[in-house]
């Protein structure tokens, strides 16, 4: 496995358990020569328990057209939308506030995202989550 050469890394955000060969998955994998259906089946099996979430995936493609993938945690935006029970953020976040979340919800989102965030402790991760919420028009109170 160590002597395989990586020829490409593809980053996608796909609905859990709902990967199919249609865009954006098909074209992104097709240009690297990956078996699209094989990836879709593997991804759907790996994300079966997380249906309803958008799960980022990082796919490493090797020179023999084989691949491996790593699943990440759902994006902060998706977690905030779920916590606030909204479908999208505010079109004008500084003027129009669309929802409110509690500091406890911010902390739980920060704990869930800690492995993927560039933060040293939970307070720094909470600040990142608060900033994302602010740019979506969601207040923390």
From Swiss-Prot:
Function of the molecule: Forms part of the ribosomal stalk which helps the ribosome interact with GTP-bound translation factors.
Protein name: Large ribosomal subunit protein uL11
Assembly behavior: Part of the ribosomal stalk of the 50S ribosomal subunit. Interacts with L10 and the large rRNA to form the base of the stalk. L10 forms an elongated spine to which L12 dimers bind in a sequential fashion forming a multimeric L10(L12)X complex.
UniProt-listed PANTHER family: 60S RIBOSOMAL PROTEIN L12, LARGE RIBOSOMAL SUBUNIT PROTEIN UL11M
Underlying gene: rplK
Protein origin, superkingdom: Bacteria
Ribosomal protein in keyword set: yes
Modification note: One or more lysine residues are methylated.
A GO cellular-component term linked to this record: cytosolic large ribosomal subunit
Protein family per UniProt: Belongs to the universal ribosomal protein uL11 family.
Coiled-coil stretches noted in the UniProt entry, renumbered to this chain: none
A GO biological-process term: translation
Keywords from the UniProt entry: Methylation, Ribonucleoprotein, Ribosomal protein, RNA-binding, rRNA-binding
Species: Tropheryma whipplei (strain Twist)
GO MF annotation list: large ribosomal subunit rRNA binding; structural constituent of ribosome
Ribosomal protein is among the record's keywords: yes
CDD domains: Ribosomal_L11
